A protein has these predicted regions:
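Transmembrane alpha-helical segments of polytopic membrane transport and secretion proteins
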Residues: 1-26, 37, 46
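Interfacial loop-to-helix junctions that mark the boundaries of transmembrane helices
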Residues: 16-23, 48-57, 99-104, 165-177
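Hydrophobic alpha-helical transmembrane segments
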Residues: 25-29, 54, 61, 83-87, ...
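Hydrophobic core of alpha-helical transmembrane segments in multi-pass integral membrane proteins
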Residues: 30-38, 180-187
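Single transmembrane alpha-helix segments in multi-pass membrane proteins
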Residues: 32-98, 122-129
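Alpha-helical transmembrane segments within multi-pass membrane transporters and channels
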Residues: 100-139
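Transmembrane helix-bundle core of multi-pass membrane transporters
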Residues: 127, 131-194
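Short cytoplasmic-facing helical segments at TM-TM junctions of multi-pass membrane proteins
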Residues: 196-202
């Protein structure tokens, strides 16, 4: 018969191994260690103003990361994302400066972004063209359109009805932070628990 003490140690080792088998566990540990190092280096790291600044920084790229995660797990590639993001922002800004209601301007700018994605999708999925070449070409094209539309200048004098979206607060937390958290949770739930999105893994 085996030694009960050795059997207990083996069972514990199996449990620990099972925990570290999840990539999420390793990522969480890396974040904890990184946070501990940054806190030791700077006492203000874990203060709310600093954490809010970090989350606000993530609120710009965060929604894009969620969409790109779905694309990448399906084996796709899109180099035009950054240019499309800038293009969408400029279109939305110019529309609001021209007097378009903020909600309508946001919808129209999202339609413009969807049009870019639709062209990419049709050329890649339907015409079987190389995604690297297509999205690289689209990146250059959108940058050119952006330069023409904005004429190389920043969009200024945005109305308060538009800027409140990025600067307004609820319970002391700015709106973009809520948006990125909600989108991240929704994206995670879709990838984990819906049949349509889980098919991207296979």
């Amino acid at each position: 018969m085996g030694n009960p003490q050795e059997a207990g140690r083996s069972a514990l080792a199996v449990r620990i191994g099972a925990v570290f088998a999840f990539r999420e566990t390793i990522l969480i540990l890396v974040l904890i260690v990184g946070g501990a190092i940054m806190t030791a280096a700077s006492p203000v790291f874990l203060t709310w103003p600093n954490l809010e600044a970090i989350l606000l920084g993530l609120s710009v790229e965060g929604p894009i990361v969620v969409g790109m995660a779905i694309l990448l797990v399906s084996g796709g590639l899109d180099l035009s994302v950054g240019s499309t993001l800038a293009f969408t922002g400029v279109v939305c800004g110019l529309l609001t400066v021209a007097g378009t209601p903020a909600v309508i301007a946001i919808v129209l700018s999202l339609v413009a972004a969807m049009a870019v994605g639709m062209v990419n999708g049709l050329l890649i999925a339907k015409m079987k063209m190389n995604p690297f070449i297509i999205t690289l070409g689209m990146m250059i094209t959108v940058r050119g359109l952006l330069l023409i539309i904005a004429q190389g200048r920043a969009v200024l004098n945005l109305p308060a009805s538009f800027t409140v979206i990025g600067q307004g607060k609820f319970l002391g937390v700015q709106y973009p932070i809520y948006v990125v958290i909600i989108l991240t949770v929704v994206g995670d739930l879709l990838l984990r628990h819906t049949r349509f999105f889980r098919q991207n893994y296979y």
